[in-house]
Amino acid sequence: MKLLSRLLGRRRPNAGGQAAAMRPYFYLGEEIALTRLKCGHFIYVDPLEESVCSHLIAHGEWEASTRRVVLGLVNAGDHVLEVGGHVGYYTLGLAQKVGSKGSVTTFEANPRLAALSRRSIRMNGYNDRVEIRQQAVTDVAGDIRFSVSRQFAGGGHLYVWDGALGADTEVIEVEGIRIDDLDLPDVKLIRIDAEGSEPLILRGAEKMLQRHDIILCIEWDLVQMSSRVQMDTFISWLADRDFLFWKITGSSELAPLTVADLATLPPCDLVVARKQPVLGLGQTR
């Protein structure tokens, strides 16, 4: 435990000859390591995972502009639903932002990632407000096949074909659930990063989406989503529910989009709501 009780304080010269602080990183074995995020949270990571964990280890952050918007969408006491929590990077920030009177319910189908996330939540003292559920969210309840990879764990998804994530792809069976079948408090924000399953997840949340003030933050990837649904039908489905759309920019701003824009939009993160959200960016870190 002595290793975990201190941070690395040594400095080394970088390529330009200037001193650069070493990233705090604690290797705990082949399966697990611990690092500290720029925001101050400690987070458990898989040292062999390259899609997200490598960035957290090297830089202490990931998708900084999107994270800033996500945290800016919630306030103390809010309730958040997260689908695709990975190792808990967004989860930790959301837990801090909603405070002890709020809650975060996070779904992560990959058992390895869910276990790491639970450890991080416990270490940072958020067990009172966060629940990590190792289940897949979709539009039909029941056991489903789910593709996982240790090297590229950020790409885990509802099964499409064998080997989709490379040589170490493994297909596991997990419990699938619908959001509308859950007994949850009044959710303000749904954050979804599900590698193309976003349309299925939202169709299983139709009752929750009837809340006038609901806000969605979703990954938008036409290629991935079109493997699940007809995109013109899905876009019309969203528009028919009076949703408006904004793209999250690299400077953490919300750029308005038309419904027509969605059909040709390159991969990005969207905020979806029925009125322009107010971002509390000054309160995030």
What do these predicted regions represent?
Residues 111-114, 118-153:
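Core alpha/beta nucleotide-donor-binding catalytic domains of modification enzymes
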Residues 45-52, 153-162:
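Short, basic/glycine-rich phosphate-binding loops at helix/coil junctions
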Residues 1-129, 168, 245-285:
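S-adenosyl-L-methionine
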Residues 59-81, 129-131, 143-145, 159-212, ...:
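Short internal loop-to-helix segment that lines adenine-nucleotide cofactor pockets
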Residues 32, 178-285:
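Conserved acidic-Pro-Pro-aromatic motif
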Residues 152-156, 278-281:
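Short, charged/polar, Gly/Pro-enriched secondary-structure boundary elements
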